[in-house]
Amino acid sequence: MKRFSCFFIWIFVLTSILPAQEREVKLKVVQTSDIHGNYYPYDFIRRREATGSLARVHALVQKEREAYGKNLILLDNGDILQGQPTAYYYNYIDTVAPHLAAEMMNFMGYNAGNMGNHDVETGRTVFDRWAGDCRFPILGANIVDTATGETHFETL
C-alpha cells in the first residue's frame, strides 16, 4: 500500500510539473438586455406582429449553439420584468405559476443574469419569485438588503 501511495504521488508530481498543452478554445458570448417583457414577437398594445422578442433571440441562440456547443455563454443584463402586458400578467395576476420570463430563460439555457433598474421597480416579491424560478445564478453585488447590509443575490 505504501509503494502504491508513493507511486501515485510520484505520478501526480510528474504530471503537475509537465508543461500544459497549448490549444485554442473559441468562446461565444451572447448577451441580452432590456427585453422589457417582449417575450413574444407580438405587440399586445397595438395588436400586431413586433420585430423583436426573446423568442426571436432564441432562434439566434440555437444557431450559435450549433456552431459553438457548450462554448456559448448566454447572459442577461436585466430589465426583463416590465414593459408588455404578458410581463405584468406574470408579475401581478398569475403569481402561482412559474414566471414566464424565468421559464423562457431556463429553456434557452442562460448561464447567468442580473437585475436591471426596471426589474427592481417591480418590487421584491416579483423579482424574488422570478429569481427563484431561474435555474441559473442571478448576480447582483450592488443589490443590498438595507435591513441586514448583506447582498441580496450571489456575488463572485
Listing of model-derived features with the role each one plays in the protein:
Residues 20-156:
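Acidic, metal/ion-coordinating pockets
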Residues 1-23:
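Bacterial Sec-dependent N-terminal signal peptides
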